[in-house]
Amino acid sequence: MAQPRIPRDLLPSDPRFGCGPSRIRREVVASLSEPGSVMGTSHRQPPVRHVVAAIREELTELYNLPTDYEVALGNGGATLFWDMATVSLVEKRAATGVYGEFTRKFSSALQRAPFLADPAVFQAEPGELALPEAVSDVDTYAWAHNETSTGVVAPVRRPNDIDDNSLVLVDATSAAGGVAADMSTIDAYYFSPQKNLSSDGGLWLAILSPAAIERSNRVTSSARWVPQMLDLSLAVTNSRADQTLNTPALATLVMLEAQCRWLLDQGGMAWAASRTASTSGTLYRWAEDNPLTTPFVADPALRSPVVVTIDIDESVDAARLCARARDNGILDIEPYRKLGRNQIRIATFSSIEPSDVEALTACLDWLLENRD
């Protein structure tokens, strides 16, 4: 027997709520095939290099960067940047905050490096936060601005009492373009563009301090063997020429530039941060008011404005709820696969309309009231 359908008047105008790859505005996708598009042209020639230059300039404006900070980019995504930071930025030992799957992955990359001492790991259970603290023999401190697997947001600031020469690296993959941050006290704010920045994956970008660039120059010119793809100093050199070491996906660059420009046109990071705080707030209030749902992150101060995780009462099969939502065209509200909880996870990235989030809560109410 066919399942009853969510009434069409309840459905969101755009049903994509995944935490990555995220919703890309339809007009941006359409622009890829318009006359004059750079698609199918050389990434070494001015039209594409102008796109790269625009991305670097727009990110500089979006984050109001100090004049001596630089934006670098390259192929491979944030996962590659973990390895790049391991070989190009950490001299002897790092300290990491681990409070979810993605913070754990960078810590594991550091652990595997045969030329580094084991990292000092500050760890919290999923849904909680642990930031690295000063350690005497550590030269690099690392954590994530937003832990995508759990929906925990962390501060972006230099830890107290660390050595003046230590670097601070912050993974911003699900925060960049949606959560405000001050770059002036940290050294690398790195990310992939497939979330708030509404592009595709496979590219990394990093906002770098002069200290990070100097460290990369020194480490990569030392006796340590560094593959070209993991040589941050080489990536910086190419970025200064508005290029990447090897051929990038042009569509990714075009969509990223369009989103950066759109965010600036809307009001910049202040507008984006206000919008994501509002849309996530809609979901957190809904989860608190519904007797069958609870925000997974107990501390309101740690609740992410861009990745909302909601526990579902044991009387409801969350996997079945997600499947029924998908059957009705509502996409990608499943939880992070390795967390293993009876929950849903919903993106409230900057491209997601507040009205669509309101509609989603109505659809979830309907599904909960009409569950089998």
Model-derived segments and their meaning:
Residues 23, 194-284:
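Active-site C-terminal subdomain of aminotransferase-like
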Residues 125-177, 188:
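Active-site phosphate-binding strand-loop segment of PLP-dependent enzymes
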Residues 294-324:
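Conserved PLP-binding catalytic core of the aspartate aminotransferase-like
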Residues 32, 36-84, 101, 105-109:
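Conserved N-terminal alpha-helix of the aminotransferase class I/II PLP-enzyme fold
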Residues 89-102:
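Conserved PLP-anchoring active-site segment centered on the Schiff-base-forming lysine
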Residues 14, 338, 342-372:
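PLP-dependent enzyme catalytic core of the Aspartate aminotransferase-like
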Residues 1-42:
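N-terminal "arm"/small-domain region of PLP-dependent enzymes with the aminotransferase-like
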Residues 183-194, 204:
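Conserved active-site segment immediately N-terminal to the catalytic lysine
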